[in-house]
């Protein structure tokens, strides 16, 4: 019999930046170099019913607390019925209350939103998938009532006047954005994948594992998060963002899409058995074939990665569809271009790895090959932009990247991932003077280019996020004081 869960479980998962391999990672023939970031999405799960709480233990551990929590039922729910309340306190009215429903014919578990307001599809789908898996593995019919708090490090969203003032008033790592979630502008760091990963992982750890099981259970959590994330976003995407959220920085080759094609919709007959087989990698016809190499890879000493928010996000799924349509209609031309891009990306990765393996602190002159490979990648990407008629590196971004590349200490930069008008990523010399120069540049920068897709760059802001190597991890509860 599985142990009763503790009162509180806390985990976080990182955002990502796909330095190379945008669009290519959609095809298993190609790879992408993805870096985890130090900006993370945090999920804190609290068990609210006495009969689901472990007896108080001495001391506390990473990610867990046995401190007694609220007693009784949540919001007057019936004794035999669990309630889940999800709260994102950094945003206005960001509360979702769900009842838990068990489906017939092995359909698993579905949550149904009780309160008014817009749905949160990523939260809802994550709950459906995680609770279905947990109930099947644990053979449990009673989850009790749960309170789930979601917190995002500040760089996931563009700064607002309210959040700026909030940050000045508080020493907390989290700020109050002062807007509704649907009004907040994302900076393109992979918040949905980090959210899904942290949410399903925290629930599975909370109900079926110990925090120390996080490492050995990472592959199963990866499979569950991929299934939930694909379902929530309409099965568009390669999964590199979830892989980075689970494993951290790595060289990524996507899984075969057929692995998830059989899972079906949550609640459909037999869903819980199909999901179990996918998570446990128990389908001999469709084994998981994701490749994640160079786990925890780091940048060379003397190099740093920074991101800049251009306050004009892209609609990734529609851009992906258009690029894939172009490739289908121009297969030979596209394959030649993608082959050249893959070859250059691999040279860049190997050069970064070679430099990172050296114990020496590198100077700017050591990074000339990196600068050359970045420029070549951009040349190929601009060619794909023109041929596909999709703004992967639109003219206003070219103007910005070219100007930044001329600054002393800047090695080079790209529009990462799917491209467009999202955050840009720069590789720079790890020197405070370079950061000072970048901030001064953005104070006076004004785009003068006439964009080929009608896009506009407003204010450009240097984000505080830096590269990191860790994936999903347990967290200490003290940092959430005042928020949970």
Curated annotation (Swiss-Prot):
GO terms for biological process: ergosterol biosynthetic process; farnesyl diphosphate biosynthetic process, mevalonate pathway; isopentenyl diphosphate biosynthetic process, mevalonate pathway. It comes from Aspergillus fumigatus (strain ATCC MYA-4609 / CBS 101355 / FGSC A1100 / Af293). Pathway: Isoprenoid biosynthesis; isopentenyl diphosphate biosynthesis via mevalonate pathway; isopentenyl diphosphate from (R)-mevalonate: step 2/3. It is an enzyme of class 2 (transferase). It catalyses: (R)-5-phosphomevalonate + ATP = (R)-5-diphosphomevalonate + ADP. InterPro entries: Erg8 (IPR016005), GHMP_kinase_C_dom (IPR013750), GHMP_kinase_C_sf (IPR036554), GHMP_kinase_N_dom (IPR006204), Phosphomevalonate_kinase (IPR035102), Ribosomal_Su5_D2-typ_SF (IPR020568), Ribsml_uS5_D2-typ_fold_subgr (IPR014721). It comes from the Eukaryota. ATP binds at residues 184-194. Belongs to the GHMP kinase family. Mevalonate kinase subfamily. GO terms for cellular component: peroxisome. Its EC number is 2.7.4.2. Residues 54-77 are annotated as: Disordered. The lineage of its organism: Eukaryota, Fungi, Dikarya, Ascomycota, Pezizomycotina. This is Phosphomevalonate kinase erg8. Keywords: ATP-binding, Kinase, Lipid biosynthesis, Lipid metabolism, Nucleotide-binding, Steroid biosynthesis, Steroid metabolism, Sterol biosynthesis, Sterol metabolism, Transferase. SUPFAM superfamilies: GHMP Kinase, C-terminal domain, Ribosomal protein S5 domain 2-like. One of its GO terms (molecular function) is ATP binding. Phosphomevalonate kinase; part of the second module of ergosterol biosynthesis pathway that includes the middle steps of the pathway. Erg8 converts 5-phosphomevalonate to 5-diphosphomevalonate. The second module is carried out in the vacuole and involves the formation of farnesyl diphosphate, which is also an important intermediate in the biosynthesis of ubiquinone, dolichol, heme and prenylated proteins. Activity by the mevalonate kinase erg12 (AFUA_4G07780) first converts mevalonate into 5-phosphomevalonate.
